């Protein structure tokens, strides 16, 4: 009987070993995923703290709330993009999900921030590209009319609204690049030689640096 039952026990042992091995792999993967999640949460928390630090919030409780709103927004966007990249969410559904986050995020910020501070948050999420670019256009083209300046600002503002929810620095800058192309076409159509003006602007910048 002992010899007859031996193969059975051997099979059971193999099964248990297989379970242990697979469990070990699963736990390892889980630990790695948990570590990556913790690292990401720390990163977005630091980003949020940096943005909030420039808002001039005097109420510490409000500052913490705003910090958490920004950090959670980063995390929610990351979850959507991760699901899209893993095939669990179609690109179209991912875009819709991202769009649905936008207004509620701004509404949450409005509970503790004024309009100017919300603009600062938007600039913080997009590396300050809007004010930098708008200033650059005015410096390069001092002859711009009020109407042209307003149109440039409108398009850069649209770019920022899109860029603030983008998944990476590259994608954020990509939105501004797209709208800058639109702006340059608009100015070229108005008779401005953008290549010539750009070269002249660079010369002025170099001349300033020498002073």
Task: Enumerate the language-model features and the residues they cover.
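Charge-rich (acidic/polar
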Residues: 32-211
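Bacterial Sec-dependent N-terminal signal peptides
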Residues: 1-35
């Amino acid at each position: 009987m002992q010899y007859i039952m031996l193969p059975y026990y051997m099979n059971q042992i193999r099964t248990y070993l297989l379970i242990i091995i697979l469990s070990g792999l699963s736990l390892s993967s889980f630990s790695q995923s948990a570590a990556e999640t913790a690292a990401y949460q720390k990163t977005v928390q630091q980003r949020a703290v940096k943005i909030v630090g420039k808002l001039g919030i005097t109420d510490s409780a409000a500052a913490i709330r705003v910090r958490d709103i920004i950090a959670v927004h980063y995390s929610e966007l990351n979850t959507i993009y991760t699901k899209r990249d893993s095939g669990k969410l179609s690109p179209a559904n991912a875009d819709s999900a991202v769009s649905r986050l936008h207004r509620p995020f701004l509404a949450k910020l409005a509970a503790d921030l004024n309009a100017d501070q919300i603009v600062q948050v938007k600039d913080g999420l997009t590396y300050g590209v809007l004010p930098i670019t708008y200033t650059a256009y005015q410096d390069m083209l001092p002859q711009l009319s009020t109407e042209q300046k307003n149109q440039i600002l409108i398009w850069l503002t649209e770019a920022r609204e899109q860029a603030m929810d983008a998944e990476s620095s590259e994608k954020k800058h990509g939105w501004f690049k797209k709208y800058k192309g639109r702006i340059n076409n608009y100015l070229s159509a108005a008779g401005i030689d953008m290549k010539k003006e750009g070269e002249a602007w660079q010369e002025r910048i170099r001349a300033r640096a020498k002073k």
